[in-house]
């Protein structure tokens, strides 16, 4: 997201692309550019995945529909040192990483540094055009690590040497290779052959060092840090590795954490319980807020949800049971599945009625139309069998997410308040939050800020008014020049977007009206399309100087705003949504706002659908990032390589940090960040 104060005025005026690239040492700028990682969920006995033609619901299936995770990370902002107030070097897994991009994970994830294809190299496999004619441009490979063949997702990759601890039944058989993807396969094979050690589920990238976290409540074991910059050998032995894997086995999760500039991404997968957690934290004005979210929000969510979506006795000691009272949540019905969709609701709709001191927030309706109730009440079931055959109240799950976020921000502000005199910059730091929890066919989304969760689904092109509404949805985010082709695509059953969360930014008139209504005495509450002339987002985690006068007073005079009254200008009140998946839903794109500097919702869905059609085994998330870079380069008169030759920091003038996760609802997940 970057610092909201910075303004761009003629940064490229009169500058030739070649002159830009010649100012930098090309041999250094790709060092720490980003990383790729991959994960495949082991085959579990008795699991039957639904076919694309059949509805996702099945009473005997308790497993999620995701299958694998892959992606990449590229940063636009440089690495910024933590203030030192919220975490010491030993607490922060990224404190030792000089690079703007870093990655750490449990052993079942594998990662590689991300490198662009050299200029004029034969490594490039394109242009390759989709036979259907879809897509804005021919698909060309710009990175050495993608598209990725599905057989390379599993980690560790099959080896001739096996330890007694390995479980062959959990290792997926590799399909036959395709020549277009041999590059990535070769890179992985070389790494495995050079680092073939008898360690169970060892990451193919050797760690730089371990993070000796002092937080006893942290869920994860000591992390394996993978930086794109360093080639140092780690300090680890078999006993330490066995200890880590033993702890990971007890906690029964696989996890990955990545950073790209000021973006942070957190993925947690429970292989046995069948759920996936994804957090995207788009920071601004510094790294402390997104780092704090990365280290604490998932743990808070896990504590609040224990007893709702799962009831693991091994984890119960980590926190209290998060059961809460039923909140207000108007229900919608999907005519196709007969199951409830809980629309986007706001924080204050879910809290107990006794919380009178909370600022009154605007109530809004879902941005998609309300659907009529065509099913009998026997089919309209809000509850679903959980992992322990206990009913799940979706409203309570959403409330648990909200409580976890509230407690995390309260702890962050309390800790920062103790250090604000020594570190006044903490009052400026904040982050957007996008959290998605997926279990089976239930998807829960919590959002604060301008990140988006966009579902790609087949339109239900019925007759009459409903057909017209489906077609109107296509026009929603499309530019004028794209409307004709997109509408024609809809007539051919091209996927259409469904945004599951409300965006909290000054682009949304409801948000602007709310802030002005809460500050009638301040004519500059929203100025130059920014809250107090500073932030485009109208809700955020942290950013205390826009929430309380005391935080604003702690800043240096040059950074202070004219704070009028005592009411907060922004809040951390999230939008919450529960969506029940159906056979029409094909994939879900989770992204920070950087993606939508160059894409509309429809264009992003259209691009992913087109790419998957051309490369069923490819990485659509990395492809979206590549397209962002191509569009940014074209906008400023550069080519792909010239843009990447500009170092982080300077490159922020052309594009933002972008984090993208594409979850395929037909068996795969792809993840990328930039």
Swiss-Prot record:
It catalyses: O-phospho-L-seryl-[protein] + H2O = L-seryl-[protein] + phosphate; O-phospho-L-threonyl-[protein] + H2O = L-threonyl-[protein] + phosphate. InterPro entries: PP2C, PPM-type-like_dom_sf, PPM-type_phosphatase-like_dom. Disruption phenotype: No visible phenotype. The modification Phosphoserine is found at residue 125. Residues 244-665 form the PPM-type phosphatase domain. It is an enzyme of class 3 (hydrolase). Its cofactor is Mg(2+); Mn(2+). Residues 153-175, 202-247, 373-392 are annotated as: Disordered. Mn(2+) 2 binds at residues 282, 593, 656. GO terms for cellular component: nucleus. The conserved PP2C phosphatase domain (244-663) is interrupted by an insertion of approximately 100 amino acids. This is Probable protein phosphatase 2C 66. It comes from Arabidopsis thaliana (Mouse-ear cress).
């Amino acid at each position: 997201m970057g610092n909201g104060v910075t303004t761009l005025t003629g940064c490229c005026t009169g500058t030739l692309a070649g002159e830009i690239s010649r100012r930098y040492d090309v041999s250094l700028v790709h060092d720490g550019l980003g990383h790729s990682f991959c994960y495949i969920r082991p085959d579990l006995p008795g699991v039957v995945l639904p076919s694309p033609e059949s509805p996702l619901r099945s009473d005997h299936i308790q497993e999620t529909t995701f299958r694998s995770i892959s992606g990449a990370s590229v940063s636009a902002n440089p690495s910024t040192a933590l203030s030192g107030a919220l975490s010491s070097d030993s607490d922060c897994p990224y404190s030792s990483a000089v690079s703007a991009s870093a990655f750490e994970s449990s052993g079942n994830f594998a990662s590689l540094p991300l490198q662009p294809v050299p200029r004029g190299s034969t490594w490039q496999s394109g242009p390759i055009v989709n036979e259907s004619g879809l897509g804005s441009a021919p698909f060309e490979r710009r990175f050495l690590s993608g598209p990725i063949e599905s057989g390379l997702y599993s980690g560790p990759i099959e080896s001739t040497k096996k330890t007694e601890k390995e479980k062959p039944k959990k290792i997926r058989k590799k399909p036959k290779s395709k020549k277009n993807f041999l590059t990535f396969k070769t890179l992985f094979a070389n790494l495995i052959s050079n680092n073939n050690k008898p360690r169970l589920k060892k990451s193919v990238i050797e760690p730089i060092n371990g993070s000796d976290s002092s937080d006893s409540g942290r869920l994860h074991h000591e992390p394996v840090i993978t930086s794109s910059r360093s080639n140092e050998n780690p300090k680890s032995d078999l006993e330490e590795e066995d200890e880590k894997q033993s702890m990971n086995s007890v906690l029964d999760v696989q996890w990955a954490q990545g950073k790209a500039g000021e973006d942070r991404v957190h993925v947690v997968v429970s292989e046995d319980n069948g759920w996936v957690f994804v957090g995207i934290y788009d920071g601004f004005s510094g790294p402390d807020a997104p780092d704090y979210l990365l280290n604490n929000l998932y743990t808070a969510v896990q504590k609040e949800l224990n007893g709702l979506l799962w009831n693991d006795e091994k984890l119960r000691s980590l926190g209290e049971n998060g059961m809460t009272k039923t909140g207000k949540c108007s229900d919608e019905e999907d005519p196709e599945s007969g199951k409830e969709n809980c629309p986007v609701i706001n924080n204050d709709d879910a809290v107990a009625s006794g919380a009178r001191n909370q600022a009154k927030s605007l109530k809004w309706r879902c941005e998609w139309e309300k659907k009529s109730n065509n099913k009998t009440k026997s089919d309209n079931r809000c509850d679903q069998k959980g992992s322990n055959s206990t009913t799940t109240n979706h409203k309570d799950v959403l409330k648990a997410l909200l409580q976890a976020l509230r407690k995390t921000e309260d702890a962050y502000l309390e800790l920062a308040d103790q250090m604000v005199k020594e570190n006044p910059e903490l009052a400026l730091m904040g982050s957007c939050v996008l959290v998605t929890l997926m279990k089976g066919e239930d998807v829960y989304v919590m959002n604060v800020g301008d990140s988006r969760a966009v579902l790609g689904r087949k339109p239900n092109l019925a007759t009459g008014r409903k057909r017209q509404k489906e077609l109107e949805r296509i026009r929603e985010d499309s530019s004028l020049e794209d409307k004709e082709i997109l509408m024609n695509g809809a007539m051919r059953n091209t996927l259409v977007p469904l945004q599951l969360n409300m965006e909290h930014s000054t682009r949304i008139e409801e948000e602007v009206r709310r802030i002005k209504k809460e500050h009638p005495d301040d004519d500059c509450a929203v100025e130059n399309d920014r809250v107090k002339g500073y932030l485009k987002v109208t809700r955020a985690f942290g950013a205390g100087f826009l929430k309380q006068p005391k935080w604003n007073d702690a800043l240096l005079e040059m950074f202070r705003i004219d704070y009028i009254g005592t009411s907060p200008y922004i809040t951390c009140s999230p939008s919450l949504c529960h969506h029940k998946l159906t056979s029409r839903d094909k994939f879900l794109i989770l992204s920070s706002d950087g993606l939508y500097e160059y894409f509309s919702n429809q264009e992003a869905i259209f691009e992913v659908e087109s790419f998957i059609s051309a490369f069923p085994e490819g990485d659509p998330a990395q492809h979206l990032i590549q397209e962002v870079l191509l569009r940014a380069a074209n906008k400023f008169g550069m080519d792909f390589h010239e843009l990447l030759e500009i170092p982080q920091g300077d490159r922020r003038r052309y594009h933002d940090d972008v984090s993208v996760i594409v979850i395929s609802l037909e068996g795969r997940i792809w993840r990328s960040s930039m």
